Swiss-Prot record:
Keyword Protease: no
Function noted in UniProt: Palmitoyltransferase specific for casein kinase 1.
Phylogenetic classification of the source organism: Eukaryota, Fungi, Dikarya, Basidiomycota, Ustilaginomycotina
Gene: AKR1
Active site: 489
Protein name in the entry: Palmitoyltransferase AKR1
Organism: Mycosarcoma maydis
């Protein structure tokens, strides 16, 4: 049995199969849950032992607790700074004291995010890199394992060394990745000692890099961040496994896609000769592997797909997509002109389906990620419709409606304004936030935000790796942060932001006015030129079968024009709503996104707890697998608690707490309990799904998603620091911020020109606590609801046999696990059973 600190064998990584459906259990992670308010999640482990030889102080209300002796270590756990000061000033303790487990007060303060306590201890001479605990780790490593970003910043500013390794070979970067905390990872990667390839790709005792750990955990955001900083996708561990091999072990589609897009070697073989594809077949994650490669246009063997029109965003595909809707709409209108309407309708539906099939299955690649949203398909439909309306006006209405010159002139102006602003809204930049020019500049930004206690998802974008301006949002389709982001509009194939919002509003307004003028001129055209409809005397031979005589007249005289007019009238159903909503929002100095957030989350700036959710990364990680998890439920409960802490609606919707399987179970249970209504419920679900899709297509889903509609009610009473009245708001919109002397692309703080008296300040969610140290959102967390995002297939009890180096599932198959040998290394010499560390305390 290996003693702690002994180099670990790579035999734990030998290939065997594991199901990618059930999330395996990581005993090391579950044992390393956070120490909160001095309460150890492993107080009762091994008959009350905490795994390091003594029981950690607990805050449970037990008889005689008040009589327990106060030590500097228990005070540091609780963040009781006055008690620490009394102990130090009286000489009863020093900042260098170690407890029975060789742990310093700074370790306990760091693991519990007691920032003020950490600062006091360091100011009074505490050793910043003191090593202690069973795993012989530093305070920086304790804080890193729990993702306490502001403790990390304090320790690093006092000279803590991120490259120090514990007895398992983990440095601060590895442990930050283990925490799945995003902002701490961003901060750690800015440290000079980790910025070089040697630091970024440093390995643990088994040769695993931080990228391998992130891939193994299915942590797509951490994988993306590491790749953006230059992590090596070709590096191998002690068993010859690359990061792609470990991503396949987890079966996370997002991680596999990111690594493949970063040119990872898909044909790399580990020591036993298996490629990532071979392992995917063996571990039953081949489905995720295939879909991940298809997302970026690759075949299963890694070859680029050979398509006639190339990728969905290629120039050839975009040109073909622009042509097909125009031609298809012409065929549809011609069908109505050639056949009776009741015969033409099914043919027109078939032609419409054919158009959609050609675009989405022949021209575009349906297997690419977000292929339809990233294409110009809907822009082509709008442009083709405008072209046919203009053709009918030039070809028929302009010359056949004498006496209506003013209406024709007004329509011509509307057509020109609409077409030009559609082109401008689709082609110009929506107002992207600037990217950092260099890694040095990025380091300065991250360090400054961390020092200010503002390094979170609302101020820093981990996708752009740049500062995020106020009122901006990162668009996953445009892959940039858009200043004063309104929404991503499929009809212009572009984001709507400060740079093109004015053109978008002119386009929608001119479209509504132009359609109304076109419909009026169409009615005049039929009134002047079409002979009155004369129905047949014998109704049994009637061919019109329409409710209004005017429609019969129009179909008899010029059905092609009628088809174009009805198609144009159909667009009024959503453009009028959109125009009214946009005009109202402009007068209130709000965007569509802000109105939506106001209804769903209670304030304009974004999601309550957004920075915390972004740091813990539980949404992205579990959506990649689409499976329910106990840790996900625990995290969701904590997020709901944060919502309540901010005074938001207790019934606020959180869409991440129900996995696919769990949702299906709930549906089936409901159907069983109400069998007589099962068909009705099915129809309701189909209607809800289809209506949701239609709303997303026309861009109105932001008003209906969850409780977004309530934003329209709350907006009138919402505190908005940018709202300066109707006239000023309209001038600011038209001048793109110049009227308020603002540059929205670089607006990081409220300027003096914007009155702070209008603003209701929402505090940032940080993992720091006050000098009292009693906890905020951390306080009520029980050990049972441990927020574990790192799991493995190993069982809680190890087989003592030296031959049983790999865990085995119920079917007798061995499992892949990066933790297997680490568990064995945690056994003390001569121990018959492994005493696993059950908190970051033993990660010392």
């Amino acid at each position: 049995m290996a003693a702690p600190g002994t180099p670990l064998s790579s035999s734990a990584t030998q290939a065997i199969s594991v199901s990618t459906v059930d999330a395996p259990s990581d005993p090391l992670l579950s044992s390393q849950s956070a120490q909160l308010d001095g309460h150890s999640s492993w107080d009762t482990h091994m008959g009350g032992s905490n795994g390091i030889g003594s029981r950690a102080p607990s805050r449970a209300n037990t008889p005689g607790q008040d009589q327990m002796p106060l030590t500097i270590h228990s005070a540091a756990q609780r963040g009781d700074l006055p008690a620490i000061m009394r102990l130090v000033d009286s000489g009863r303790a020093t900042v260098h004291d170690r407890d029975d487990d060789n742990i310093t007060p700074l370790h306990w303060a760091a693991i519990n995010a007691q920032l003020a306590t950490c600062r006091y201890l360091l100011d009074h001479g505490a050793q910043v890199d003191a090593l202690g605990g069973d795993l012989i780790a530093s305070p920086l490593q304790w804080a890193a394992r729990n993702g306490h970003v502001y403790v990390l910043e304090l320790l690093c500013s006092r000279g803590a060394d991120p490259t120090i390794t514990d007895s398992q070979g983990f440095n601060a970067l590895h442990l930050t990745v283990h925490s799945s905390a995003v902002m701490p990872l961003v901060f750690m990667l800015q440290q000079p000692s980790l910025d070089s390839p040697e630091g970024l790709d440093s390995t643990d005792s088994q040769g695993h890099t931080a990228l391998m750990w992130a891939a193994y955990q299915g942590d797509a955001i951490s994988v993306d961040i590491l790749l953006k900083h230059g992590a090596d996708v070709h590096k191998r561990d002690g068993a010859g496994l690359t990061a792609m091999h470990w991503a396949v072990v987890k079966g996370n589609r997002l991680c596999i896609r990111l690594l493949a897009d970063a040119k990872a070697d898909l044909l790399a073989k580990e020591d036993s000769g298996k490629t990532p594809r071979d392992m995917a077949i063996e571990l039953k994650s081949i489905g995720a592997y295939r879909k991940a490669l298809a997302d970026i246009g690759l075949e299963e063997d890694g070859r680029r797909k050979q398509r006639t029109f190339g990728a969905s965003t290629d120039r050839t595909a975009r040109l073909a997509t622009m042509v097909v809707p125009f031609v298809a709409l012409g065929f549809i209108f011609a069908t109505f002109a050639a056949l009776p309407w009741y015969t033409a309708a099914p043919f027109a539906a078939a032609e419409l389906f054919g158009m959609h099939h050609i675009v989405t299955r022949v021209i575009l690649d349906p297997h690419e990620h977000d292929f339809l949203q990233r294409s110009n398909y809907f822009l082509a439909i709008v442009a083709g419709s405008i072209a046919w309306v203009g053709w009918e006006w030039v070809h028929k209405l302009a010359s056949a409606t004498p006496g209506y010159a003013s209406n024709n002139l007004f329509f011509a102006l509307s057509l020109i304004v609409c077409s030009w602003n559609l082109f401008r809204a689709a082609s110009i930049s929506p107002g992207y936030a600037p990217l950092v020019p260099s890694a040095l500049h990025r380091r300065e930004i991250v360090t400054q935000l961390a020092q200010q206690g503002r390094l979170n998802g609302q101020t820093y974008c981990v996708s752009c790796m740049a500062r995020k301006p106020m009122r901006s949002k990162h668009c996953k389709l445009c892959k940039r942060c858009v200043a004063r982001h309104d929404h991503h509009c499929p009809w212009v194939a572009n984001c709507i932001g400060v740079g093109n919002h004015r053109q978008f509003l002119l386009f929608v307004g001119a479209l509504v006015v132009g359609v109304l003028q076109f419909l009026y001129l169409t009615v005049v055209y039929y009134s002047i030129n079409a002979p009155p409809y004369d129905p047949l005397p014998d109704s049994s031979y009637e061919t019109c079968h329409l409710p209004f005589a005017f429609l019969c007249t129009a179909t008899t005289f010029d059905a092609f024009l009628l088809g174009v007019a009805l198609w144009a009238a159909l667009q009024l159903t959503w453009t009028v709503i959109l125009l009214v909503a946009q005009a109202w929002q402009i007068t209130r100095q709000m965007t569509t996104l802000e109105v939506s957030n106001l209804g769903r989350f209670g304030f304009m700036g974004g999601k309550g707890g957004q920075s915390y959710a972004g740091q813990t990364n539980f949404i992205a990680q579990h959506s990649g697998r689409g499976q329910p998890s106990g840790s996900l439920s625990a995290a969701t409960d904590r997020l709901q608690g944060i919502h309540k802490q901010f005074g938001e609606n207790e019934n606020a919707e959180i869409d991440v707490n129900l996995g696919a399987d769990e949702s299906a179970d709930a549906t089936s249970t409901h159907a069983h309990a109400h069998g007589s209504h099962s068909k009705l419920n099915l129809l309701r679900r189909v209607f809800a799904s289809s209506s949701s899709w239609l709303l997303s297509i026309v861009g109105l889903d932001l008003y209906t998603r969850g409780k977004a509609g309530e934003g329209l009610k709350r907006a009138s009473a919402a505190a908005n620091p940018f709202d300066h009245g109707l006239l000023s708001n309209c001038k600011d919109f038209w001048s793109r911020g110049e009227d308020l002397n603002l540059d929205y692309t670089t607006l990081y703080d409220l300027p003096a020109e914007v009155s702070p008296g209008h603003c209701q300040v929402v505090p940032f969610l940080v993992d720091t606590v006050t000098a009292g140290g009693r906890g905020g959102a951390w306080r009520n967390r029980s050990p049972a609801s441990g927020y574990s995002l790192l799991r493995s297939g190993a069982d809680d009890d190890d087989d003592d046999s030296d031959n049983a180096t790999m865990p085995v599932d119920a079917a007798g198959r061995r499992k892949w696990s990066m933790w297997s040998n680490l568990k064995k290394s945690a056994k003390p010499p001569g121990s018959a059973t492994a005493i696993l560390p059950t908190s970051n305390a033993t990660h010392a």
